[in-house]
Amino acid sequence: MNKEIQQAKHSKNINKPFTDKDSIRVSVLSEALPYIQRFANKRIVIKYGGSAMADKTLQNAVFRDLALLSSVGVQIVVVHGGGPEINQWLEKLGIKPVFLDGLRITDTETMDVVEMVLTGRVNKQIVSGINNHGRLAVGLCGIDGGLIEARTLGGGSHGLVGEVAKVNTKILSPLLEEGYVPVISSVANSSDGKSHNINADTVAGELAAALGAEKLILLTDTPGILRNENDPSSLIEKIRLSEARELIDKGIVKAGMKPKVECCIRSLAQGVNAAHIIDGRTPHSLLLEVFTDAGIGTMVMGRG
């Protein structure tokens, strides 16, 4: 009798009606399939920053997204910042953060803290988060393997703030081919051996170009490029390279968005297929961008 009851229950479960939620799940998987096939063994560089780094729930969503992208064969490179945590540690150590034109003034003492926080703490937290979701991440900075050579920005008025002088991706290619996820902090040495702090957006863009990446994705605290910075509904979903330059020239793109768009422009000019500025405050925004028809945020197109 018990066996008959179990069989009846099993039969009932098999014949259970398909719900709307079930249909949505199937639809999502079906929509994702061509993108999974398209981006298998392709390289995507992701700049991880903003609220997605500060909020624990968003952090976990990003780590899951990165693990999923890697598990279906996408070759992922993660570049990260960590400004808020740097400020917290400077405060703990009694060092007052100083900024000029939006950039941190980085003397030797401050640079020691920047390197400690970015490379020793934030980087390892990200590596651990990805590893906890079943993938193998490797923590690096620009110094490792001569990955990035820095050049002091401008006339040195910002101290040890640098820009990218050279990129050598030799250390990255074998890691990517073996399925590892390189996680890179934006600290690099200049030719004279001095550590420099480089804007993480800039590092991500230059790495994307050097790696011949399919996409550059910047996680931000904004929906994307807005025609009116105070109106989220003015989001520009797609824009060509020439149009992006015009928005900067006209002053529509300004302040914190300007260096991000400039980063996209430089990477596209060097052969990256597409650059995306997306809202990292939206859970699973990476998957929405890569694996759905509609995408999310702003796509800056380099071709056509």
UniProtKB/Swiss-Prot annotation:
InterPro entries: AceGlu_kinase-like_sf, AcgluKinase_fam, ArgB, Asp/Glu/Uridylate_kinase, Glu/AcGlu_kinase, NAGK-C. The keyword Membrane does not apply. Its main location: cytoplasm. It catalyses: N-acetyl-L-glutamate + ATP = N-acetyl-L-glutamyl 5-phosphate + ADP. It is found in: Cytoplasm. GO terms for biological process: arginine biosynthetic process via ornithine; L-arginine biosynthetic process. PANTHER family: N-ACETYLGLUTAMATE SYNTHASE (PTHR23342), N-ACETYLGLUTAMATE SYNTHASE, MITOCHONDRIAL (PTHR23342:SF0). Belongs to the acetylglutamate kinase family. ArgB subfamily. This is Acetylglutamate kinase. It comes from Prochlorococcus marinus (strain NATL2A). The gene is argB.
